Amino acid sequence: MTFSLVLWHELSDEINRLPDKTRRIIKTALKRLEEDPFPESQGDKEKLVLRGGVVIYRLHISLSYTAFYDIDKEEKLVIVQEILPIEQAHKKYGYF
């Protein structure tokens, strides 16, 4: 099953401001989500249940970044909401 990848807000601009190598690594990792966004298939993805029962998915990208995304199974969309350096991701979401 193939999904379409959607970047939330201004993520495209943020990604394009990164160094070339980092940008390639992030784009390659995000592209893999189109084929299989679900955590069961690879260890770099995880389903998180946040406070209030909100579900979000996490993708480790290299050792430097984490992408947070949602999956719309009905529309076959992967909606990337945020890409953060690992340290910021840990501070913001705190427990993983």
Question: Where do the model's predicted regions map?
Answer:
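Short alpha-helical linear motifs
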Residues: 8, 48-52, 68-70
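Generic structural signal for secondary-structure transition and capping sites
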Residues: 20-23, 35-38, 88
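Residue-level signal for beta-strand positions within conserved beta-sheet cores that form or flank
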Residues: 1, 55, 76-79
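Enriched for short, Lys/Arg-rich terminal
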Residues: 13-16, 61-96
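Arg/Lys-rich, positively charged N-terminal/basic patches that mediate binding to nucleic acids
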Residues: 1-31
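Hydrophobic beta-strand residues in large extracellular and virion-surface proteins
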Residues: 26, 33, 78-80
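A short, surface-exposed loop/turn module that caps and links secondary-structure elements
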Residues: 32-60
